[in-house]
Amino acid sequence: MERILGVNLSGWFIPEPWVTPSLYAATGASNAAELQEAMGTAAYNERMRRHYETFMSEDDFRRMAQIGLNAVRLPVPWYTFGSQESDASYISVVDYIDRAIEWAAKYDIRVLLDLATVPGGQGDSNDSPATPEAVAEWHSSTNGRHVALDVLERLADRYGEAESLLGIELLDTPQMSVHKSLFTMTDGIPAHYLRNFYRDAYELVRSYMPEDKIVVFSSSGHPNEWKHFMRGAKYKNVYMDLHLYHYRDEYALDITSPRGLTTAISRNKRELKEAISTGFPVLVGEWSGAAIFANSSVTPEGRNAYERVFIANQLASFAPAAGWFFQTWKTEKRIAAWDARAALGTLERGMIE
């Protein structure tokens, strides 16, 4: 398969305050559920309908192809096909996914559909500079598993044989519970629950998708936990998704120093090596140019220069991977470290490839 060089299309079907702050203006909301509650169902759905119509266009796909990209990772919500719940109502986004699939085919771009939300939440939402601490209660909800499997099956049924479909990611970055010590576990979804879900989800989507389409699961930040997973002959074209960020928590690094830059790139290489050692082809499903700037005297121009060097070095470190998806294609305020039009658009095509 051709190496995957892509971008995420975050904020299109799942409104993100850091991508499109105008959607949240004067509401006090920080996620889709809060936004709907603040606005009321009818006003919320009308605002989202306008957003779905205008946020992405065919010209975006043309520009992606123009700078050398050949894939998009498209986060979709559990209510992709619409939902009428007692406390909330969501309109379907499938007509807009149809457009993405058609535009992608026109410009020789492949689409990875990524189930990015589930009822109750899957936890580790690590895709933005300002995401609140997420909650993982999906495995405890009464119908969460059924809803997730249902939307995956319907996505595979509708798009499984589409020429431009790269594949389906079964669940975006679930927070997995692992051993913190001999007798204690971290918060999150039990590993056995995720493994069983992934096996069942694989069976469902593969029944609609030919074997050349990939099925992706998240490492959940612990690649070694998956060493002996999905090893039977019936599992075809299964990829692992690894996310690599350097802007917060213990991974926050100052890239204005040579040591900080070297440490970040060494971490990329180390974690990629660990993931690849499991035997799965590995995709860096999310990464960005975001990092820490400890030197307050760095000018905006200087910051852009540091980020450009950081991005170029990260691209080189991803060489062993089967591909990558920058986070994200576009932001309303054109945030340089997170907006591929700024971050990748000025790079020479050879650096991306």
Enumerate the language-model features and the residues they cover:
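Short, loop-centered acidic/histidine patches that primarily coordinate divalent metals
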Residues: 77, 81, 285-288, 329-330
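Glycan-binding loop/region signatures in secreted carbohydrate-active enzymes
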Residues: 4, 9-54, 264-272, 277-284, ...
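Aromatic-rich peripheral "rim/lid" segments of glycoside hydrolase catalytic domains that contact
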Residues: 299-353
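Conserved beta-strand termini and adjacent loop/short-helix elements that scaffold enzyme active sites
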Residues: 114, 218, 243, 327-329
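Extracellular glycoside hydrolase catalytic/binding regions
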Residues: 150, 157-160, 164-167, 171-320
